[in-house]
Curated annotation (Swiss-Prot):
Keywords of this entry: Methyltransferase, S-adenosyl-L-methionine, Transferase
Catalytic activity: 2-[(3S)-amino-3-carboxypropyl]-L-histidyl-[translation elongation factor 2] + 3 S-adenosyl-L-methionine = diphthine-[translation elongation factor 2] + 3 S-adenosyl-L-homocysteine + 3 H(+)
SUPFAM superfamilies linked to this entry: Tetrapyrrole methylase (SSF53790)
EC code(s) of this entry: 2.1.1.98
Quaternary structure and interacting proteins, as annotated: Homodimer.
InterPro entries the record matches: 4pyrrol_Mease, 4pyrrol_Methylase_sf, 4pyrrole_Mease_sub1, 4pyrrole_Mease_sub2, Dphthn_synthase
Pathway(s) annotated for this protein in UniProt: Protein modification; peptidyl-diphthamide biosynthesis
Species whose genome carries this gene: Methanocorpusculum labreanum (strain ATCC 43576 / DSM 4855 / Z)
Binding positions for S-adenosyl-L-methionine per the UniProt entry: 9, 85, 88, 113-114, 165, 204, 229
Function: S-adenosyl-L-methionine-dependent methyltransferase that catalyzes the trimethylation of the amino group of the modified target histidine residue in translation elongation factor 2 (EF-2), to form an intermediate called diphthine. The three successive methylation reactions represent the second step of diphthamide biosynthesis.
Name of this protein: Diphthine synthase
GO biological process: methylation; protein histidyl modification to diphthamide
Pfam families recorded: TP_methylase
Length: 252
């Protein structure tokens, strides 16, 4: 059996009761650490809370060397833990398909997801979001333009854009909102586009999340504090959305 369990957004206390029961009864516990991380709970705290040894998994462990996971699930009870909700990342869907190819039973226990948490924190209506996009760290001469293309297409349809910021867990490197805004502004400059407003969110799901809305210069000057950070590029605001951002995100 392979059970996919979403752990929620911030620390060890965000897992559901059903998820916790499944972890405690598992023979093998894997934790995927490359699409997102629980910043409020290092792996040692998770192990202490669950009473289980946890094997961390990086991208190649899941996408290339998944047999270790599948073997554990074929011959025992394995759980595959992720921050947020398990099936938001395509790579996790692929793992479930490969398990089915080997006739391994699978099940999903959902957790809170950043894709819905940002709506509560920002007040932006979830049905008004278009395609999401990720901003990676540039590498050498590689400077992808996909983010501004997606944002521009969404704005044309009057849709908000959720912008994920790069995570390099193996290097303990987490993109900041100020870095992402710099990259997006450079992309916008290259295609003669404009981004009039951003909403930045830090540490969603924690006891003290930070939310701030403003233009590029305001966002780069604002101190969002420690990671994880995420961005939204809003379309034209509904009056309720605007009032929410004014009250809870410092929008002027």
């Amino acid at each position: 059996m392979l059970t996919f369990i979403g752990l929620g957004l911030f620390d060890e206390y965000d897992v559901s009761v059903r998820g916790l029961d499944a972890i405690k009864s598992a023979d093998t516990v894997f934790l995927e650490v490359y699409t997102s991380v629980l910043m409020g709970a290092p792996i040692e705290r998770l192990e202490a809370f669950y009473g289980k040894k946890i094997t961390p998994l990086y991208r190649e462990d899941v996408e290339i060397h998944a047999d270790k996971i599948l073997d554990a699930a074929e011959f025992g009870n394995a759980v595959f833990l992720t921050a947020g909700d398990s099936m938001v990342a395509t790579t996790h869907s692929d793992l479930r398909i490969r398990a089915a190819d080997r006739n391994i039973p699978t099940t999903i226990i959902h957790g809170a997801s950043i894709t819905t948490a940002v709506c509560g924190l920002s007040g932006l209506q979830n049905y008004r979001f278009g395609k999401s996009v990720s901003v990676p760290f540039p590498y050498g001469k590689w400077f992808p333009m996909t983010p501004i293309e997606v944002i521009s297409a969404n704005l044309k349809e009057n849709l908000h854009t959720l912008v994920f910021l790069d995570i390099q867990k193996d290097k303990e490197r987490y993109m900041k909102i100020s870095e992402a805004v710099d990259l997006l502004e450079e992309q916008a400059r290259r295609v003669d586009a404009g981004i009039p407003l951003y909403v930045g969110i830090a540490r969603a799901g924690s006891p003290e999340p930070t939310v701030h809305a403003g233009n590029a210069e305001e966002m780069k000057a604002f101190d969002f504090g420690s990671p994880l950070h995420i961005l939204i590029v809003p379309a034209t605001l509904h009056e309720i959305e605007r009032e929410y951002l004014e009250r809870f995100a410092g929008l002027c």
